UniProtKB/Swiss-Prot annotation:
It catalyses: XTP + H2O = XDP + phosphate + H(+); ITP + H2O = IDP + phosphate + H(+). Disulfide bonds: none annotated. Mg(2+) binds at residues 38, 68. GO terms for biological process: nucleotide metabolic process; thiamine metabolic process. This is Inosine/xanthosine triphosphatase. It comes from Escherichia coli O45:K1 (strain S88 / ExPEC). Its cofactor is Mg(2+); Mn(2+). GO terms for molecular function: ITPase activity; metal ion binding; nucleotide binding; ribonucleoside triphosphate phosphatase activity. It comes from the Bacteria. It is an enzyme of class 3 (hydrolase). It holds the Pfam family NTPase_I-T. Substrate binds at residues 8-13, 68-69.
Amino acid sequence: MHQVVCATTNPAKIQAILQAFHEIFGEGSCHIASVAVESGVPEQPFGSEETRAGARNRVANARRLLPEADFWVAIEAGIDGDSTFSWVVIENTSQRGEARSATLPLPAVILEKVREGEALGPVMSRYTGIDEIGRKEGAIGVFTAGKLTRTSVYHQAVILALSPFHNAVYQPLQA
């Protein structure tokens, strides 16, 4: 059984990770543990590089906390231009897989508050009246009329980031 450490306590992210690992490695093949770790970037990262750095930092911090695991996984959401998205970083003892999620264009009224320094989650909670929306359907669920959620979009990115771990073609070439 794979020991998987999620570098988050966010239920939407944990569910995406759990679903993806079960789909790739089989139902019941993984034990998931979650840990709260720092990202080393602002609460609301801006740009692809800052957001990816946050996910990488979370993985590194989770590895320090639970070094005996088989996989460490982080999902960091950010703002890039006028859209929200996330980076998924997965590591085992010898490899890293990374994938960027789909992006969701955000309305100007939401972006204005985020650019003033507020994190997207609290802005969306005020806009919708849904407490802790970032731990639930997120802006994605709201603006896609529930057709997609944070979990469903993150799930796809986790599946993509897992590709190097179950496809031999990703293994380094032997010299």
